[in-house]
Amino acid sequence: MTLSAYLALALILFCIGLYGALTKRNTVIVLICIELMLNAVNINFVAFAKYGAHPSVHGHVFALFAIAVAAAEAAVGLAALIAFYRSRKTVQVDEANSLKH
């Protein structure tokens, strides 16, 4: 595959994730879409590390670091989601403003 194929794949994944994050009301789906967007960025890191002007391992290492951070973010997000569900019995994004009161 060429660099443009990887970039096109990453663009498609990012757009799908962005669309889902902006239009869906279920918090679980929004978290999944955010993870999809992060994976699209990781594809860009690896593609530029392989096909860039100076190919190196730095892009791969940064992608691994981003995956670790995304895993921690997903764990914190799901923990917050469980706490929200226990208090409000819903996982809809529209109900999240009720946490203020």
Curated annotation (Swiss-Prot):
Any one of the GO CC terms: NADH dehydrogenase complex
Organism: Geobacillus kaustophilus (strain HTA426)
Keyword list, A-Z: Cell membrane, Membrane, NAD, Quinone, Translocase, Transmembrane, Transmembrane helix, Transport
Chief place of localization: membrane
Reaction it catalyzes: a quinone + NADH + 5 H(+)(in) = a quinol + NAD(+) + 4 H(+)(out)
Single biological process term from Gene Ontology: ATP synthesis coupled electron transport
Spans traversing the lipid bilayer: 2-22, 28-48, 62-82
Pfam families: Oxidored_q2 (PF00420)
Family affiliation: Belongs to the complex I subunit 4L family.
Subunit comment: NDH-1 is composed of 14 different subunits. Subunits NuoA, H, J, K, L, M, N constitute the membrane sector of the complex.
Its membrane topology: Multi-pass membrane protein
Disulfide bonds: none
Name this protein carries in UniProt: NADH-quinone oxidoreductase subunit K
Localization annotation: Cell membrane
Role noted for this protein: NDH-1 shuttles electrons from NADH, via FMN and iron-sulfur (Fe-S) centers, to quinones in the respiratory chain. The immediate electron acceptor for the enzyme in this species is believed to be a menaquinone. Couples the redox reaction to proton translocation (for every two electrons transferred, four hydrogen ions are translocated across the cytoplasmic membrane), and thus conserves the redox energy in a proton gradient.
NCBIfam families linked: PRK05715.1-2, PRK05715.1-3, PRK05715.1-4, PRK05715.1-5
Lineage of origin: Bacteria, Bacillati, Bacillota, Bacilli, Bacillales
E.C. numbers: 7.1.1.-
One Gene Ontology MF term: NADH:ubiquinone reductase (non-electrogenic) activity
